[in-house]
Amino acid sequence: MTAYSVSPSGEKFKIPEACQYAEEMARLEKLAAQARAEGKEIVVVMGVGFVGAVMAAIIADTVDKTTGKPSKLVIGCQRPSTRSYWKIPLLSRGQSPVKAEDPEVDPMIARCVLQKKTLVATFNSDCLGLADCVVVDVQCDYAKHELGNMRSGEAEMSALEATMRTIGEKIPPGCLVLIETTVAPGTTEFVAWPIMKKAFAARGIAGEPLLAHSFERVMPGREYVSSIRDFWRVCSGCDAEARRRVEKFLREVLNTEQFPLTVMDRPIESETTKIVENSYRATILAFLNEWSLFAERNGVDLIKVIHAIRMRPTHSNIIFPGPGIGGYCLPKDAGLGYWAYKHILGFEDGDQVFRISPTAIDINDTRALHVAELTRDALRNMGRYIAGADVLVCGASYRQDVGDTRYSGSELVVRKLTEMGAEIRVHDPYVEHWYELETQDVYPAPGHSWSRFFRNQSGLKDIRVQKDLAAAIRHAEAVILAVPHEAYLKLDPDQIVGWAGQPLAVVDCFGILSDDAIRRCFELGCEVKALGRGHIQRIKEQTRSKASGST
């Protein structure tokens, strides 16, 4: 039976057959020979997903700083699975396999593929035999087996281990291998390096693998490319030669003149830097959860408190957590450290050592459930039930003004409300498909959907993200402002009620509503609840007191 890979837009691509591999390799060998004749280095990027596709384009866009001529030929390699192969034909025709708000992404990929011809894509991992450098952008996920219990999870190393095995079996001696993936501390030295060393020995290669680590700090949004190319990097290598080579490579492809490299002594230090960096951020956000609840119950507006704290320069980066933190890194990275401490580094006292980081992850993973409680309570105050209520969730992505839905707090809001019997609609100006819902049986991987933690989830596969806010809110009984997208920041209460055709429950997850807007909502007969904004009750009482005094 013919197998196909289907792109997010629904385009079908036939999976390559065994007879096509030799022809594909001949094509790549010809391109590589021509590139070498022009003095170019051959770089293979393993994995052309969220990070790898843009990193491949950045490398392919590199020019020699003396001559100004292109200095790299990049081969983006993706395994030909039904889930991922579609990225290769898209990239081959100059289209980005990842959706990005950054206006630099699409033109850069098109330029490198179609004009400069410094970026090609393939399904054939034999291309590794042509490489001077390999950049590894293969996921190393952390699977949580219980919601709100990070300690029950485990790092998913199999894809990375298989990739490193393939690399060790195929690269030429002297090829630099750079792991760019965020990995459990110790992975480069104690997992990847032994795999490669064993593969080298089986091939009769006496030399040591040249293995390095340098994590990315990619941030989706309008500065997607800059967050990779024009940002500070940390790197290290398994030995002095690997450190020298990775430093040279990164200086050639990144803007290290303005954003200097930090070179660590060992890869475990580079790996730990990324884990601690993200765990710190996750912990600060979790810390604010308790003060958010305190504020709600004691008449305090935490939004104003945070603004006041930001006036102090040392605390200027404090932010309100919203309904969970989301994104690919912050919800999982502390788990990689916790898991590595036992399973890679061999210590048995992890539960005594790691007290704060796991708790922070658990708090962040479950914060969104409180939004469902607030929605229930707001409807109850209007004499309505959450079961059967039409609820509009405004914002599916994990952060403002991007279309990235990975581990968004909104997903848990939707799932919990669905479990409670609500009828859900979703609006988001940036999200075309919410794959965590639409394809929840297989996305992000079979058996990994958050749907397994809730009942009554099958109907969510039919949800489609709406683009017309006025149409989406029509006849809604509740609206949840889940993400501070620009489109939601100046919503007029009169307009909201007019579109809905009735007063409704309004739940603010990010301090989107001003005090005047909250007051107007009450004047229109709405009920308002919000994360961390206990002063709303005071506004409600003042509004009703004023209304009763005028009658």
Question: Which sequence ranges carry the predicted segments?
Answer:
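Structural/interface elements that position substrates and couple domains in central-metabolism enzymes
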Residues: 1-551
